[in-house]
Amino acid sequence: MVMVRDNQFLNLKLSPIQAPTTIPPCRFPIIPATKVSATVSSCASNTFSVANLDRISVLGSGNGGTVFKVKDKTTSEIYALKKVKENWDSTSLREIEILRMVNSPYVAKCHDIFQNPSGEVSILMDYMDLGSLESLRGVTEKQLALMSRQVLEGKNYLHEHKIVHRDIKPANLLRSSKEEVKIADFGVSKIVVRSLNKCNSFVGTFAYMSPERLDSEADGVTEEDKSNVYAGDIWSFGLTMLEILVGYYPMLPDQAAIVCAVCFGEPPKAPEECSDDLKSFMDCCLRKKASERWTASQLLNHPFLLHQD
């Protein structure tokens, strides 16, 4: 099945999926986080009540539902409450399942999940006061390194626990005034059950897809490339960081032009005026062959990140 998150490029109609009436129990254990305090609770903690949350404003609305800024009446803490659309489907189920699993300071935390008698589902999450990276443009190399390190820490955590995001882009990376950056939106993510379970299906946002995801049958795409299930996330990450650096999407925002550029052209590169370390970093993220792209773990040890300390 084909699913594209950004309909400005493709307008595809999917067969309707019958929504279940209740959330199924989580089939996977909560994953312990590295570098996280032992006091951090699991997602379904039952420590919150919807009645105890005051809605302050609407933060955004999309295919997955509406997100509100809310305040806990007891603690005065601010959170984001995602109200899933009534006709929630496998995309919503997938996001809920993954949110129940993950526990990392580099991934937007799920504090609780609520379901009312009518079946309406809401997810209480971290509130990131500066919104997404979508509005952030023209940063310094030092700022880019700080953001890149946090996103890669999150990617490394997810990949180590066999979760492929498949929709890394500026809109799905959230930031706070504390200089925190966290990965969000797991609607099209996938849990890799077997090490060779291919996740290069055509899902995510078209403009940020890697060559092997745009066309897995193209000349030069090997079985090794297809089985490298995590490399597509690295391409999307590299393109996202390059966009934030230069201040605009680095390719023509047209479907045919993107396919030609990504699948048949040279990979995007950092501007000439950038440092050699940054040029190398981008090259390691945006190699055409998936098998040649660096992993999140390798990129965390790249000189571009190490030399910014």
Curated annotation (Swiss-Prot):
Keyword Chloroplast: no
Catalytic reaction annotation: L-seryl-[protein] + ATP = O-phospho-L-seryl-[protein] + ADP + H(+); L-threonyl-[protein] + ATP = O-phospho-L-threonyl-[protein] + ADP + H(+); L-tyrosyl-[protein] + ATP = O-phospho-L-tyrosyl-[protein] + ADP + H(+)
E.C. designation(s): 2.7.12.2
InterPro entries to which the protein is assigned, alphabetical: Kinase-like_dom_sf, Prot_kinase_dom, Protein_kinase_ATP_BS, Ser_Thr_kinase
Record has Phosphoprotein as a keyword: yes
A Pfam family annotated for this UniProt entry: Pkinase
PTM summary: Phosphorylation at Ser-195 and Ser-201 by MAP kinase kinase kinases positively regulates kinase activity.
Gene3D superfamilies attached to this UniProt entry: Phosphorylase Kinase, domain 1 (3.30.200.20), Transferase(Phosphotransferase) domain 1 (1.10.510.10)
Family per similarity comment: Belongs to the protein kinase superfamily. STE Ser/Thr protein kinase family. MAP kinase kinase subfamily.
Listed name of the protein: Mitogen-activated protein kinase kinase 8
Organism: Arabidopsis thaliana (Mouse-ear cress)
